[in-house]
From Swiss-Prot:
Entry EC number(s): 2.7.7.72, 3.1.3.-, 3.1.4.-
Source organism per UniProt: Aeromonas salmonicida (strain A449)
Record-listed ATP binding positions: G8, R11, R91, R137, R140
Species classification: Bacteria, Pseudomonadati, Pseudomonadota, Gammaproteobacteria, Aeromonadales
Protein name per the record: Multifunctional CCA protein
NCBIfam families the record matches: PRK10885.1
Cofactor: Mg(2+); Ni(2+)
Alphabetical list of HAMAP family matching this protein: CCA_bact_type1, CCA_bact_type2
Amino acid sequence: MQTYLVGGAVRDRLLGLPQGDRDHLVVGATVEQMLALGFSQVGRDFPVFLHPKTQQEYALARTERKQGRGYTGFVCHASPEVTLEQDLLRRDLTINAIAEDEEGRLHDPYGGIQDLEQRMLRHVSPAFAEDPLRILRVARFAARFHAQGFVVAPETLALMREMTDAGELAHLTPERVWKELEKVLLGQTPQVFFEVLRECGALKALFPELDALFGVPAPAKWHPEIDTGIHTLMVLAQACRLSPELAVRFAALCHDFGKGLTPPAFWPSHHGHGQKGLPLIRDFCERFRVPNDCRDLALLVSDLHTHIHIAFELKPATLLKVFDKADAWRRPERFAQLLDACRADFHGRTGFEERVYAEPDYVAQALGAAQAVPVKDIVAAGFKGEAIREQLAKRRFDAISRVRDEWTFIDEE
């Protein structure tokens, strides 16, 4: 019986990166032997065990045979006769198919170390094409290791394109797609994920709302990058810089979906695009079963981001309506997320990365002043019933007006 450290722990150590979970591979053992050594079995589809002391995962060496469509149609075969090379052959990328034995020796039958040195994401074997989920995984790895200079090998990208053209992505479950998307959005450079998917055609197959934005122009004065798809990925990058929160990053991704519906005759203007994008966002979220907090913020950002951008032009009564519509009184934390997404939208433009954008600060101060209006004073003044609500709105209006009078507005021209 031989035990090896495999997968991400070996890869990340060789890259000089912090190691995450330590997964182990056991060659030449049976289930009975593992149980006799005190391991507890947790795998249902194939034999995976937890170490009695460290609780790290140990899996018996296995092979996989495709039987059916999609990423779940596999039959696994684990036995003492399965070799290290056979087990590593079933893995997705060469950089994930390196093993380290108990003496610290590396076993690299498929050139993973060389690909680490060359910063290349390359598939291990043609069996890569049997699992459509690997298209998303490769794109996610490209995003994850972008800072280290990794790119997808041309032959792997070509295989991903063939898989996409064959309709393999249709066999992925919504939950699995969202799980990959969630991991990507919580990373450092999620825009790379979408760039890779676009290169292999998977963006159009999975996320047509986003793919439709590429090639759609916006006014050069406000969008020197011109292309709305490029702008969206720039906004996503800015959202990652501004906020670690999944909902903010997802809202940044969806905020301009409505521009994909603008008839070319009206380009580069996109009047009302925020409202036009709402049905697209709802459909996207329903399709992939996106969590409610992400969906709700994305809808708010799409609907209201243009209002925030022109906040200095809004009358206090209009700003009060924005607060009401966003339920800012009861959900101030979500409203702060809305402002972060608007900041990302403003700065996610060529040449606008460091420009002053004071509107969210003004809006936040106006909201704070309106929130500070004490209801108890209105009640103490003798107002009752509907009159309380009317008086509260009036005093909030006055509070916003005072903030507005105190601000020196910035001319962006």
